[in-house]
């Protein structure tokens, strides 16, 4: 985003004195993005979406498989030198709607390669929200032990009505790291369904609480942030409609 640096500047300025600095992940898709993220105060971790779909990789980042892998290796070296964390998201991990080859063995091969490069934090991503809860659970269960020493999380997109079931399927399979977004803000333009987006943080927390998990976050404490997010979404939704 063109004003990411200004957003981070205002965010840091607004932190109450004595507040522990949260982890901030800067998502990048090319070298220029990496340079900006590393130079932005407050960014603690670099994130990169590595797609195992050739079509999606071209559409999202205009890269070949070789170019994308070379960038991952560059990210690993740069973050090691700078002291930043690094997480790679395996995009299209749960299936491929573009009639390309897909299978658990492709995901496993990618995980093994990422470990060999030096990655220790990887997330399986359902980029277009086409996985069922059963698929989420079965793939995670199959992948969690194939790369010892790698913390494996999930980054799931979903329609609201199926979101909690997918979270619980991953949790029951052993996942302990989940990505979410307040009110389900954001998503992927390639999903082809306006109702598919990031799973809401509040949905994830409620689902995990139903399993007795101690997530360290009180839902009631999130209420003001959720309300603010809803106001922002409404504001920009109305602005977009006015432009149309």
Where in this protein do the model-derived segments appear?
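Catalytic cores and adjacent flexible loops of soluble metabolic enzymes
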Residues: 1-244
